[in-house]
């Protein structure tokens, strides 16, 4: 050992670098002494209880925070181990509050731990600020009541330290604000109100912070278990249909059957540029039971020469127009009836006789004789149309029956 010391001393006097074996020895010595130094520092750390007047052997919050900030850089360990060592320095209310906070937030870091300690036990705020923060602390949307009570306790301790609330009234004030600012189930709310009425003059009998947390968590566990038992299980096809609606995805007809009326309602999806009203057809599934000659029921009457039959794109047939004696719908078999739509007519000008515009927007400068001639031609066409319809009176009704 003496030779090693002499060699190290001579090397340092000559400003020469240390040999490799010296570096290895110093690293081993540091690894051996580091845990011992940390344990000695832990034994010398003062404890903090969270009380307004610290007991013998306990420190104020400011002194406790100073020594924690001094030893934290020397703790070369995980965040979880650091939190465990910090918890060992707490006693009384401070330990219980931080234990509950850690239970509510399993991923709590050291920085968040110290920030919460400052909020609960740090410097007192002004009386006006502390008063406003406490009485304006409300339960957030989706927040559990147990977590809300922890937030409320932080503001309550600040208000007590600011001197606006008496410590002997803490239990009553906590309960009153909880009933005002939290959404509780009916049973728990009734129990807490009953306790307030029963012990109005014996506030020491009211539940304190820890007892209140226990009551709330028992109710939350019961509610969670009850909801899991009563929650209905949805079938797989229904959820898939709800997740991916079929509306406006194609022209495939949808049939809705009813056991009471034995009929089908056929619907074909519209295109985006079709603004016409649709005709909904309700046809019996059993044509043999329908009285002879009775026309099928329609949701709304349509002129027979104003309908357009639209087939599904999956069918081989193309779109077809109905004639003046057409029925307005197509029957490909039992229960396979397509819905009909109105035909879009072009506009004819009564002034010049051309199509594509009306009389009010006509730009042609024709004489009155031309106007009268066009009018006579139009009247003749209407007369011939009426005569042809009278010659075949039963053509409409015969063609409208489904085959």
UniProtKB/Swiss-Prot annotation:
Positions in coiled-coil regions: none
Skewed-composition ranges (Polar residues): 312-324
Keywords of this entry: Metal-binding, Zinc, Zinc-finger
InterPro entries membership: PNMA, PNMA_C
Keyword match Cytoplasm: no
Pfam families assigned to the protein according to its UniProt record, in alphabetical order: PNMA
Region (Disordered): 312-337, 382-403
Keyword match Calcium: no
Chain intervals with Basic and acidic residues compositional bias: 383-403
Superkingdom in the source lineage: Eukaryota
GO molecular function terms noted in the UniProt entry: zinc ion binding
GO terms under cellular component: nucleus
Zn finger residue spans: CCHC-type: 347-364
Recorded family membership: Belongs to the ZCCHC12 family.
This protein's name: Zinc finger CCHC domain-containing protein 18
Gene source species: Homo sapiens
